[in-house]
Swiss-Prot record:
It comes from Barley yellow dwarf virus (isolate PAV) (BYDV). This protein is translated as a fusion protein by episodic readthrough of the major coat protein termination codon. It is composed of the major capsid protein fused to a long C-terminal extension called the readthrough domain (RTD). Readthrough of the terminator codon TAG occurs between the codons for 200-Lys and 202-Val. This is Readthrough protein P3-RTD. One of its GO terms (molecular function) is structural molecule activity. Residues 608-621 have a biased composition (Low complexity).
Amino acid sequence: MNSVGRRGPRRANQNGTRRRRRRTVRPVVVVQPNRAGPRRRNGRRKGRGGANFVFRPTGGTEVFVFSVDNLKANSSGAIKFGPSLSQCPALSDGILKSYHRYKITSIRVEFKSHASANTAGAIFIELDTACKQSALGSYINSFTISKTASKTFRSEAINGKEFQESTIDQFWMLYKANGTTTDTAGQFIITMSVSLMTAKXVDSSTPEPKPAPEPTPTPQPTPAPQPTPEPTPAPVPKRFFEYIGTPTGTISTRENTDSISVSKLGGQSMQYIENEKCETKVIDSFWSTNNNVSAQAAFVYPVPEGSYSVNISCEGFQSVDHIGGNEDGYWIGLIAYSNSSGDNWGVGNYKGCSFKNFLATNTWRPGHKDLKLTDCQFTDGQIVERDAVMSFHVEATGKDASFYLMAPKTMKTDKYNYVVSYGGYTNKRMEFGTISVTCDESDVEAERITRHAETPIRSKHILVSERYAEPLPTIVNQGLCDVKTPEQEQTLVDEDDRQTVSTESDIALLEYEAATAEIPDAEEDVLPSKEQLSSKPMDTSGNIIPKPKEPEVLGTYQGQNIYPEDVPPMARQKLREAANAPSTLLYERRTPKKSGNFLSRLVEANRSPTTPTAPSVSTTSNMTREQLREYTRIRNSSGITAAKAYKAQFQ
């Protein structure tokens, strides 16, 4: 029989030998990133490592969401992504202090609008990967203040390809709003993904040294009470104002086959709008140039001291109105423009202004060749309207700073006169067109260019030019006729060409002198010059002189034929009447019909009522028919001086 020993003591000894000592473990605090991946299903814990276990050096990816609040309609600033990101302490003061390297791989910037739908303006953002910019330099990325929107930037745009040291910023985001008020605009909500690498171990068993006790401060004398600081005044709001109006001038016209004259310009009433208030202001105007061919008006706009973006819209149409009587203000015609491509609206310095980025768009509308206005047609390139859109940046210095707006030339010859004809010169009111001048102190260049490009051009107008140009030279107001600009220093206006406002008696005297100059034997040269003839050849009675297809013989004198070019217009008409009338009429005395025209009465008073005017002997004597033809040919081709020299050979 086998015996079995006691197992109790043996079991006790075995338990004693198997008893393990407890090992003291120094706790180590290690920041562990979030684990991306599924959890274990069986719930078993991983085997423990050593006491100083460190997580995988590649780290992980964290997602941070933070906001930038209380953005105003005129706010600006910079958001620095990295250890300087004060808007997100979880990144700058938290996780970046636990890792050596990091990189931000993507960000999503959402602008959440808190503004009303009527709030105007936009907020622009720009990414600076060099971390050096102090102000916004690009206006490509923007959000409308009144709308919520978002933008996403990948690693290529934010320098997120490579890991950065956790002590330096990866990139900055600069922002700036272009509103003019301090109204609330909204907030930025920014979501970013951050990759981390090389964690730092923080040993919590090693106590940090206690700070040394500060020395007892030496008591300081009680300072004198300081005055209560005054509150910082609010910034001065940016100015935005506008001039709108239609300037006018007084002109004198007679028949539409005659030139016009202009009166001195003065103050022009313009509508002035600023801060939603409207009032009437008077600006100065004057003729910058004036001669017998054209006159050019300039309008002076005062500008407060500062820097402004200016946009000007001009719709040039020289409408003419009647003055006085029961029809005061009734439309009576127009003065057309020339078709010169360089005769456009322009801007220049009048006092204390400098310009840059001057952009001008010029258009015109010609008159149709079949249109007839006051018995005149638009068959020679006359322009009915001249419009322009101009924008530029102006720096105004001094309290009296101003710039001038130059209108296209007002043509004074009969070619551009489409006003109802009258027997004598009378004053009429001429408009220069509608002008709008807008000045904005906000100095947003991108908005100025956009405003210029979006200004509508009149439908079907012909584009003359659209380009950056130089402003006009500085001018001063020196009166009606004596203004000189630097471009006109070599062009002197003769005394005979200078225009003044004449009275009716002065005009009548000039008409009388011009008429008596055509009377035979009044002067040596009785033939009218080219300057005395208008575009439509007419005699002094107002009859159109027909152009003969073949040489017309008006009569004979001393055996020689008399041709139309050999006699003055008045004698030419008398000879035609004598040739067409019955022979008995040559000897009848007929009472001449009295004309109501003032000039005709003056001319007829100096004529003999019985004897008709005969051809000038000084023109036709001692010359054969062939010599007369040669005389006429020389006069038409070489001028009156050469013709006189030829005629002197036979006297």
